Amino acid sequence: MWFAVVAIFLALVAFLYRYVVGSGPNPFAIDTREPLKPMVFDRKLKNKVLKQGFLASRVPEDLDAVVVGSGIGGLAIAVLLAKVGKKVLVLEQHDRAGGCCHTFKEQGFEFDVGIHYIGELSNHKPLRCIIDQMTNGQLQWDPLENPFDNVVIGPPENRRIYQIYSGRKRYMDELKKCFPGEEKAIDEYVRLCKEVGQGVWVMVLLKFLPTPIANFLVRTGLANRLTSFSRYASRSLTDVVNELTQNKDLRAVLSYIFGTYGKIPKEASFSMHSLIVNHYMNGAWYPKGGATEIAYHMIPIIEKAGGAVLVRAPVNRILLNDAKEAIGVSVLKGQEEVHVRAPIVISDAGIFNTYEYLLPKDVQTMPAIQKQLSMLQHGDSGLSIFIGLDGTKEELGLKADNYFIYPENNIDELLEDYRSGNREESAKKNPLIFVASPSAKDSTWPERTPGKSTLTVVSFANYEWFEEWKDDKVKNRSTDYKQLKELFINYILEAVTEIYPKIKDRIEYVDAGTPITNQHYIAAPRGEIYGADHGIPRFSAELNATIRAQTPIKNLYLTGQDLMLCGFAGALTGALTCGSVILNRNLHLEAFSLAKRVQNGNNKKKT
């Protein structure tokens, strides 16, 4: 007994020294923002940064780390290490860097694939400060309209549209106008979201604490009592909302944003939901110049420290020594393997790809790895539709906002029926359609692509519906596959043109990306939108104490959304967590500290 107490005490002391006092280099030691430089719109110039192909001769010597995957989790950890002088190589299997932050161009239209809107980017907010430091202050943001989201419920003949405003008071006041008599429910919902969301630090704590202490907190149940976030983690969004109100439309409106983390309300943790509600409570933004601006401004920081970001570099395995320690990666170049050695290997490829594809079979069977895999499931897959339009946003009635379209307010039942149906029938009754205009959100669009506009649509779609065509050539899949895509496109377009009637005769381009499209371009094993599943089990104390940046393989680390949470901000948080472990310093606290110093400095300038 006493031995255990002493061991836990010593582990706690070590933790406090490592993550509170801070012993390693600090990438947030100084404010690295620079004066804004002119934006670059020339695609050839941008491609020189974003599309640097892999060659053995381009691999820097004496690497400090190699990162698999160039999504925001991979680029961010590379930038953090580069800022303290580390030489990092980032390897991307696609032909351009950025992961879900990349864009593509078809018939003169540019489409983003994953960045729709981001919250918490007011000046001096910690997230804004982190991104400013990651891009040396070169990434600019355009605010969305207020209201930024529109929730559409019901068929055309009985349609109700509820608008979601930013600003806590405005958000509540506008909802109360729509739902008289429900003031108490709305007040309690907003209060709960704030209280629960503020306790998210417990997730980070469990990943940082020494394993004996974390396990002690889990076994004794103390971890579930630390914050409201812990206490509500096992409660579904449906249960919490249903306790607040009997009004079915209000229930749907309070739940509408579940699509941004990919779980239907009855399967979603209220703790996860509270984070998203708080994330957008004070507004939403879109990257000025499009999503490629993110990677475009991060890569030079990696290169300045001697590193590189190389594309068309499919990593086929992680190299291990005889002691089963990671010592580098193997890249397939044609039929040959190129070995890249580094003392640290960081995977932004997702936990399933990392453990089930990149590690040897005998290592995959390690109990510690199997335990982690048993705790997770693949997330839900999705369908994206890309629409190119002839006309300006003014001519077509497009705004910098989003629409969430539901055929009725019984969301759980609609989605369960949709997911359990056969693919042809389900294509005709899509229960959730997210639609937005990236071109209307980007203030540089009229200069870059005059007279044209775009819409992007996202919805759920089962991987199994498309799985039979996964081995077809990407640009030459079968006629049956194309016909199924057309079926989904046609029925979804009906709903979209009801919201945007002016686009009916102005569509010049339309195509869809299915789960197997995601599988090919972003290496999502089952076409997942948000990596590992974000349902209730994802938020258990045991899982968060078990899945850490440091994997069971020495020198192999995880970064990105599978380590922490989904989405841009979640993957970025995963990079901070990974960097904290590698650099022996709590980068979450350091980022908050720098944000405070920058804010105080600006306040002094004003006075």
Swiss-Prot record:
Belongs to the carotenoid/retinoid oxidoreductase family. CrtISO subfamily. It catalyses: all-trans-13,14-dihydroretinol + A = all-trans-retinol + AH2. It is found in: Endoplasmic reticulum membrane. Its EC number is 1.3.99.23. Its cofactor is NAD(+); NADP(+); FAD. One of its GO terms (biological process) is retinol metabolic process. This is All-trans-retinol 13,14-reductase. Keywords: Endoplasmic reticulum, FAD, Flavoprotein, Lipid metabolism, Membrane, NAD, NADP, Oxidoreductase, Signal. InterPro entries: Amino_oxidase, FAD/NAD-bd_sf, Retinol_saturase. It comes from Danio rerio. Gene3D superfamilies: FAD/NAD(P)-binding domain (3.50.50.60). Its main location: endoplasmic reticulum. The gene is retsat. It is a peripheral membrane protein.
